[in-house]
């Protein structure tokens, strides 16, 4: 009977922020639900910190509450993750990414591996800021020459803390020699370039993750 077992599912690393600014509940729920159906999913945060969910609504509050009770809700330490063990990388929209992931040396090491091996990467909304940590020794960005999307300045400027943001993704991407596009604020907008999928905002989570699943499916 052993020979009739289904092949083991590929492993996907879901990286989220551990900062107080948190992780979008809407984006995380869609990421986790869609990805866990296709992958063996491992959640990781800097220091293994518990996730603070923001923008919790009536529609996802129960899911978030149930998730917190599960054993797999305790994230692994990003610092101890070996990127070579994973087939795909998924970063939901995390306002906190600007605080911790955007300057994470551990995530930079993982992203450099994924870039060199052309493994599928998907980053959404504020999670796109996490990609900014991955620079080469000469300070060039590993995604130079790629096309991306992420939060537009028009979306960011509506938040009260805009003036204090440590990083504007749109500016970083353009200054680093990559292409940036954005649609109207809150519109669904996804860019696929080679093995990199980016979504403009939390509303773009589902089609972005579907593109990640498509990329992984086409590699079998």
From Swiss-Prot:
Top-rank taxon, per record: Eukaryota
Subcellular location: Secreted; Early endosome
Protein name: Glutamine amidotransferase-like class 1 domain-containing protein 1
Function description: Component of the FERRY complex (Five-subunit Endosomal Rab5 and RNA/ribosome intermediary). The FERRY complex directly interacts with mRNAs and RAB5A, and functions as a RAB5A effector involved in the localization and the distribution of specific mRNAs most likely by mediating their endosomal transport. The complex recruits mRNAs and ribosomes to early endosomes through direct mRNA-interaction.
SUPFAM superfamilies recorded: Class I glutamine amidotransferase-like (SSF52317)
Subunit field text: Homotetramer. Component of the FERRY complex composed of five subunits, TBCK, PPP1R21, FERRY3, CRYZL1 and GATD1 with a ratio of 1:2:1:2:4, respectively.
CDD domains assigned to the protein according to its UniProt record, in alphabetical order: GATase1_Hsp31_like
Gene: Gatd1
Keyword list, A-Z: Endosome, Glycoprotein, Secreted, Signal
Signal peptide stretch: 1-35
InterPro entries: Class_I_gatase-like, Prot/Nucl_acid_deglycase
Glycosylation sites: 203
Major localization listed first in the record, in broad terms: secreted
GO CC annotations, alphabetized: early endosome; extracellular region
Family membership noted in the UniProt record: Belongs to the peptidase C56 family.
